[in-house]
Amino acid sequence: MHIPLVEPGTVGPCPVAPDALQGIKRQQTNPARWNGEGWNDFVADLRAVGVEVAESAAMRGIFATDAGGTAYGMPHGVVVAHSAAQVSALLKAAQVHRVPVTVRGGGLTTEGESVAYGGVLLDMTGMSRVLAIDAAALTVRCEAGIYWHLLAEELRREGLDYLSAPLNMTSSVGGTLGVGGIDVNSARLGCSADQALALQVVTPTGEIVECSDGEHAELFQRVILGYGQFGVITEVTLRIRPYTPLRMHYYYYSSLRTAIEDLQLLDRNDASDYSGILTIMDCAVNLLVAFDSDAREAAFKANWEQRLRGYGEFGFALCMAGHYALRPWRISEAAYLLRRKQAVFPEFRRPEFHRDGRMEDRTVVFSRAVWKHWGSRNMVIPDLATSAGRFVEAVERGNAVCRKYFRHYTLYCVGIKLRADHAPHYEMSCVPPGAEGWAYGCEFEPMIEGEVYSRDHFQSFKNAIYDIGVDMGASYYRFGGMMKGYIRRVFGDALVDRHLAMKRAADPAMILNRDVIF
């Protein structure tokens, strides 16, 4: 099969995207490997200014894939970032020699966005220091390669905490700000990207720039939620808050629609500090609600708890027992629900992470559970992001796709409070066009459980979910990398071409994260 070479930033003859398999509709492949032209001169230029490039197979192999485990590639070399000046030198040399630069933090992408198909991989984890904590102003300045859990450790020594961050211990701060960052308190506080007050950014041409809403605002708008296209974030100033443990409550539903309606009721009325939905298929739907303070919890119990239509754990168990007693042919499904409950639920109640009935560190608790009970060699997590009004429909349609492709799966739903003043940040991002007040996202995650599925099966599943987004005018949290063929279909040529023109102006050689979006 002949796949024609295309210039980065242009659309090839395939109606979906460059490098799509011609014989399989919307089947995506890894991009073609960069041919290595100019590599030796590029390395020589870097070493002349004191930037070390690791070229051993062992070092390069560490970065052969990402958390998704479905995309594989090898860089020609690896540079571990240690300073903005070093990153600047690298990008300047890359522009001269037209060497692709792939930036990687925690490597938690799932569609190959942080996998290098040749060129240089820039590992940001070498920049992982906390530079300053201002307890009075409630801000922190840190380097962008730091993991959120390391930032939390530093902050909590001062009785402080970040506002919202992904529920994963090995997400990097800079990588998170480039894609959004969703927490179970995002329906109240917004996504992680909205907590950034200022950034130090190295542009694709090597200029080191401090930017914020008031300084170099256009660059700030493009880098935040920019999927790494307009610069490398090297330092970040974030809003923070006093640390408080939280108290969790769980409500159980047998209906996705009812649970989502109750979730949105709480979000609209600011009735909880944390909220989200985690399911076992569509049979056991768990609405999680949590509070930072006794006063907020008491107000919820007085005004809102009685309006929820979910059950307590014991009541839901009785409901399920009656349901399956009348449907004995589904006893294997009931047995799976029971096994899953017995395996997963204790993770959220481990005594070492609780004190006086309060959860001390939600990131540790949720991250442990994710990797222990959802992680596998492949992480296939397509998603849909919609306005509040269309979310129920999106989840129900996505759920039907999950049932078609996999025996067992999990849905994770959460809201994101939007800032009207950050509308320019949200353009061509995971925030769906037209969403006001809140956007909502749902991850559709199959439970692999040791079974072997072909790459085509995974891809067909993802296509079926993403086609729903096209039909509904939605967006996605993961629309880059191997799924970038959907970008034009969702956002339209006019918007994509405008961003592509900005990308070409900012990155003349199209070297920075070239296979992620354009």
Q: Can you name each region flagged by the protein language model?
A:
Residues S56-M59, L167-N168, I277, F479-G481, ...:
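Short coil/turn segments at secondary-structure boundaries
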Residues W34, A54-I133, V140-A144, H149-S164, ...:
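Glycine-rich N-terminal segment of FAD-binding domains in flavoprotein oxidoreductases
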Residues H2-D19, G178, L197-E393, A400, ...:
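C-terminal substrate-binding/cap subdomain adjacent to the FAD-binding core in PCMH-type
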